[in-house]
């Protein structure tokens, strides 16, 4: 089984894939290693996700999420390894890479996320090659929900 996650700060969508077919979709609260400690992430995984998982071992985890910078990805990988029955690789990537892969596939293009926080990048068909820091969800995000007029 492969476990795939698409996470923002508000919610995380999870999907179990077996032999290339999605077999179960689940949801938990958002997981963001920029705002949550390793222990907080472990608690969410143990109490909210683990009870929803089907019996069996997870061969690989692909986590795409807000706050998954190269500096914070190890925190997330450790939390997953300590909380879930994973015997294989645990990969943690940014939500921006998920958007770029989903939108562009293997072609070059510009991908954007418009949500609580907004972001954009230029993707060369394999990786993000240009990205301007979005400054979080409070600064430089004029469309966000925290503005009061």
Describe each region flagged by the PLM.
Residues 39-53:
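Short, well-ordered amphipathic alpha-helical segments that serve as non-catalytic structural scaffolds
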Residues 52-84, 88-91, 103-104:
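Short beta-strand-loop/turn "lid" adjacent to the catalytic site in phosphate-handling enzymes
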Residues 12-17, 101, 112, 118-123:
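Short beta-strand scaffold segments in enzyme catalytic cores
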Residues 2-6, 60-62, 109-113:
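Short glycine-aspartate micro-motif
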Residues 90-98, 113-114, 139-140:
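Active-site nucleophile and cofactor-binding loops and adjacent substrate-binding regions
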Residues 147-149:
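Conserved small/polar residues in nucleotide/adenosyl-binding loops
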């Amino acid at each position: 089984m492969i476990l795939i996650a698409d996470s923002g700060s508000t919610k995380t969508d999870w999907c179990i894939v077996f032999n290339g077919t999605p077999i179960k979709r689940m949801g938990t609260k958002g997981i963001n290693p920029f705002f949550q400690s390793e222990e907080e992430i472990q608690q969410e995984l143990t109490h909210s996700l683990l009870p929803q998982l089907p019996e069996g071992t997870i061969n690989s985890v692909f986590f795409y999420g807000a706050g998954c910078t190269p500096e914070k990805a190890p925190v997330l990988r450790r939390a997953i390894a300590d909380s879930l029955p994973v015997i294989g690789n645990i990969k943690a990537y940014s939500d921006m890479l998920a958007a770029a892969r989903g939108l562009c596939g293997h072609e070059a293009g510009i991908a954007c996320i418009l949500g609580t926080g907004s972001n954009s990048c230029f993707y060369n068909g394999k990786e993000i090659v240009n990205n301007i820091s979005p400054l979080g969800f409070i600064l430089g995000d004029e469309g966000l929900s925290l503005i009061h007029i």
